[in-house]
Curated annotation (Swiss-Prot):
Catalytic activity of the protein: oxaloacetate + phosphate = phosphoenolpyruvate + hydrogencarbonate
UniProt cross-references to HAMAP family, sorted A to Z: PEPcase_type1 (MF_00595)
Cofactor: Mg(2+)
Lipid metabolism among keywords: no
Lineage, broadest ranks: Bacteria, Pseudomonadati, Pseudomonadota, Gammaproteobacteria, Oceanospirillales
Family named by the database record: Belongs to the PEPCase type 1 family.
Protein's GO biological process: carbon fixation; oxaloacetate metabolic process; tricarboxylic acid cycle
GO terms of molecular function: magnesium ion binding; phosphoenolpyruvate carboxylase activity
One cellular-component annotation, GO: cytosol
Name listed for the protein in its UniProt record: Phosphoenolpyruvate carboxylase
């Protein structure tokens, strides 16, 4: 590794790599390890502009005997995973997140002082943080490539590194940790990297709960303690006891859009799992508290509650523990399909758990035992405030067309015609009238289709569940007010009094452009306002809009839609919460959370925000307590700053510039992706898209429909496929033409540089584009093409795309006024450079295996098929993202 990288990171990569080498030698012999070293050496020299070494590498890989292909791919895949462990460990130990620009790493203490310096009163700080509502929504897609079995081993390896570093003067402890490390690496090597079956939605939900148990359960009280201390120092006050600036929700088990595996029964099971896991975790907390709170001094209120018991805290906690254990047993019985009988009442609400703990806390403070009150008891109070009785709030997501189908069948059954044939005004009139009507609409014995029955059953599950366990009902592919009214009516018909927030999801370019008009019309309906109250949630889709229109056009449409929504909700005196459906990659709205939030339009955050955390990003951001703590700090910093120190409104000339850039980029993108007849055949030929369906990433199918072109693909495999070949096309196509056009005009360069310097939205976009181009590699993309594409027309298209990428890099460097990419972030550049010699062989092997697979018409041996899947996992690990 480069000598500039931190010594401890270098040492840990070397320790893990050496141990992996010994493990492989024990399994396959020293001769095989020599092959790995030969491949690595050729790849390393090939990265030093040695074209002969690059040629030798390809020849060497193509000449490997079939029996070596799988273990070679596994060796490089595991090394990249171990590099990720070392990097993750480094970040946790030094509490540093490598941002895009030096000096932009958010610091909560510094931010509080900056806010005070801007003239905000100390009380304003406390009130803003206490009222802050940031929900991080854990989702299962683009899913985690690495098996959870291996994740547990990797976490244990990280613990060994921690032990070894902390035992420099205790050789026997360090030696035991080294021995355990060798064992774990051997376990990982002898474990299949690829799942044999796709995880079920319940499996995904269990993984989400495991992240809470293993990481967030500790990180949440740690975060509140830090926030408490900083507020006390800066504002002279502590955070209110029941404040929960950051909470967690989930789509795992609730997101049924395009996933037939998420049924009403699955949703009910996941809700019960959340109740069971929460009760189990609280029971552990209460056992500890019952052991520790042996004091006899108590205030009158607690004495009145427990009587003359000599250990009043234990007496109260004993009762509470019995209820929590009964809740755990009840949930388990429901999951097992068994009856449950107990004379102890179960815990139904957050307050039933919180109130007894608060009584203990107040009593301890009243009798002068504040130090004890602010220990483990306060941690549990904070957990209850954040996690409630279900750990996460479960969102429900369904596509608008499924609700329309319900009313189409229903209107036909009632002799009213076909709902699908009605125009928007007719639909609204019907839905609003039924929302006001006291009589039921759905017949008791209605013989509807299985699809409609499933939708209704889902609403019945929602109706049976306590409101605290549920989050938002998200409507994907929403385009009209009737899409929201339909869900409201289904809640009324099936759910009675239960009303969840309903969030239309605007995810195509046209939908984003119409979002303001839809919400304006919706909020102007008196019947809807009476039902919705003074709040409205709207979800902004990043993945599909970028696939639909190109990244630059989508980013600008998202920005403008948010501006319009802020203005409309302000006019209607409605509190707007924006829900950002971001992924891990640039093409799906990914990037550093702090920069992304601060690049939103002024007024769009205002203390309230929801954002998805997806797949492998959950592990990178929240998989370990220290890193989870840092991630929560970043979100708190960004939302607090965006609320109290919002960015300035963009200047009118900047808007005009973005309108023009967006239009040029959109036309260039559509001209290739939608209008070039060679594009889809090229995409299918040059990427591993067709093989992705066999990679058991998650419970969701890779395609919305089995036939069709790019439009039938979900955004996740669309981006995954291009990432594998290093062309990274979805995140940049069209941008180069837009920027080049402007640079060729008088004053264009100065205007773009000014926008970059003074407009966070534009600056953040360019920063993410720079990172993306640093990971792209046209030479690797060209090799895939040489190996997999025969038709001259397709080869010509590929050459054109690579030339566009090269021109974009030149144009971007001009705007940035730099000689090289990532010139000002050398750590990130070095991290990419260090990984390349381990990723390059996987690209070479993947192209070879794809060609063999096609030659065999998909009938390659199971070993080669597995090797192909391992190359995909390894490249994703090396680039630190999937889709």
């Amino acid at each position: 590794m480069s000598h500039d990288l931190h010594e401890s990171l270098r040492d840990n990569v070397r320790i893990l790599g050496d141990s992996l080498g010994r493990t492989i030698a024990d399994d396959l012999g020293d001769g095989f390890v020599d092959k790995i070293e030969t491949i690595r050496g050729l790849a390393k020299r090939g990265r030093q502009d040695d074209s002969e070494s690059r040629r030798e590498l390809i020849e060497y890989l193509r000449a490997l005997p079939e029996k070596d292909l799988l273990p070679v791919t596994r060796a490089f895949n595991q090394f990249l995973n171990f590099s990720n462990i070392a990097e993750q460990h480094y970040r946790a130990r030094f509490r540093r997140v490598e941002d895009y620009k030096p000096g932009t790493q958010p610091d909560l203490g510094e931010l509080l002082e900056r806010i005070r310096g801007a003239g905000h009163a100390p009380r304003k700080l406390v009130e803003t943080l206490a009222a802050m509502r940031v929900e991080l929504v854990l989702t299962a897609h683009p899913t985690e490539v690495i098996r959870r079995t291996l994740i547990r081993k990797y976490d244990a390896i990280d613990e060994c590194l921690t032990t070894m570093e902390g035992a420099t003067e205790r050789e026997e402890i360090a030696a035991r940790a080294r021995g355990r490390l060798e064992e774990l690496i051997s376990q990982a090597w002898h474990t299949d990297e690829i799942r044999h079956e796709r995880p079920t939605p319940v499996d995904e939900a269990k993984w989400g709960f495991a992240v809470i148990e293993n990481s967030l359960w500790q990180a949440v009280p740690d975060f509140h303690r830090e926030l408490d201390d900083l507020l006390l120092a800066s504002a002279g006050e502590r955070l209110p006891l029941d404040a929960a600036p950051l909470r967690f929700a989930s789509w795992m088990g609730g997101d049924r859009d395009g996933n037939p595996n998420v049924t009403a029964r699955v949703t009910e099971e996941v809700l019960l799992l959340g109740r069971w896991m929460a009760a189990d975790l609280y029971a552990r907390d209460l056992l500890r508290l019952k052991s520790e709170l042996s004091m006899w001094k108590a205030n009158g209120a607690l004495r009145a509650e427990v009587g003359s018991d000599p250990e009043p805290y234990r007496a109260l906690l004993k009762r509470l523990l019995a209820r929590v254990e009964a809740t755990r047993d009840w949930a388990k019985a429901r999951l097992d399909g068994r009856p449950f009988d107990s004379n102890v009442a179960i815990i139904e609400t957050r307050d039933q758990l919180y109130a007894p703990l608060l009584s203990c806390y107040r009593s301890l403070c009243d009798v002068g035992l504040d130090t004890i009150a602010n220990g483990a008891l306060l941690d549990t109070l904070r957990r209850v405030a954040v996690f409630g009785v279900s750990l996460t709030k479960l969102d429900i997501r369904q596509e608008a067309g499924r609700h329309a189908q319900v009313f189409d069948e229903l209107s036909d059954c009632l002799g009213l015609g076909h709902y699908r044939d009605w125009d928007e005004a007719q639909r609204q009139d019907f839905l609003l009238e039924e929302l006001e009507s006291p009589r039921p609409l759905i017949p008791r014995r209605w013989d509807c289709s299985a699809e409609t029955r499933e939708v209704i059953d889902t609403f019945r599950v929602i109706a049976r569940e306590h409101r605290e366990a549920l989050g938002t009902y998200v409507i994907s592919m929403a385009g009209q007010p009737s899409d929201v009214l339909a869900v409201a009516l289904l809640m009324k018909e099936v759910g009675g009094d239960l009303q969840l927030p309903i969030a239309p999801l605007f995810e195509t370019l046209d939908d984003l452009n119409r979002a303001g008009d839809v919400i304006e019309r919706l909020l102007s309906l008196p019947g809807y306002r009476r039902m919705a109250g003074d709040g409205q949630e709207v979800m902004i889709g990043y993945s599909d809009s970028a696939k639909d229109a190109g990244q630059l056009a989508a980013a600008w449409a998202q920005y403008r839609a948010q501006e319009q929504l802020v203005g409309i909700c302000r006019q209607h005196d409605v509190a707007l919460t924006l829900f950002h459906g971001r992924g891990g990659t640039v093409g799906r709205g990914g990037g550093p959370a702090h920069a992304a939030i601060l690049s939103q339009p002024p007024g769009s955050v205002n203390g309230s925000l929801r954002v998805t955390e997806q797949g492998e990003m959950i592990r990178f951001k929240f998989g370990q307590p220290d890193i989870a703590l840092r991630s929560m700090e970043i979100y708190a910093c960004a939302v607090l700053e965006a609320t109290l120190l919002p960015p300035p409104d963009p200047e009118p000339v900047w808007r005009e510039e973005m309108d023009r850039l967006s239009d040029i980029a959109h036309r260039a993108y559509v001209g290739v992706v939608r209008e070039d007849p060679d594009f889809v055949p090229y995409f299918r030929s040059v990427t591993p898209e067709s093989a992705l369906g066999r990679l058991p990433l998650g419970s969701r199918p890779a395609k919305r429909r089995q036939e069709g072109g790019v439009e039938s693909l979900r955004a996740i495999p669309w981006i995954f496929a291009w990432t594998q070949t290093r062309l990274m096309l979805p995140a940049w196509l069209g941008s180069g033409e837009a920027f080049a056009t402007r640079l060729d005009e008088p004053g264009g360069r100065e205007r773009l540089r000014d926008m970059r310097a003074r407009w966070p939205f534009f600056g953040t976009y360019l920063d993410m584009l720079e990172m993306l181009l640093a990971k792209a590699d046209p030479d690797i993309a060209a090799y895939y093409e040489r190996r997999l594409v025969d038709e001259p027309a397709l080869q010509a298209l590929g050459k054109s795309l690579r030339e566009r990428l090269s021109r974009l890099e030149t144009v971007l460097l001009d705007i940035l006024d730099q000689d090289t990419l990532l010139e000002h972030t050398p750590l990130i550049r070095q991290a990419i450079e260090v990984r390349n010699p381990y990723i390059d062989p996987l690209h070479g092997l993947q192209a070879e295996l794809l060609q063999r697979n096609r030659d065999a018409d998909g009938a390659i041996s199971p070993e080669l098929s597995r090797a192909l899947m391992v190359t995909m996992a390894g490249i994703a690990a090396g680039l630190r993202n999937t889709g």
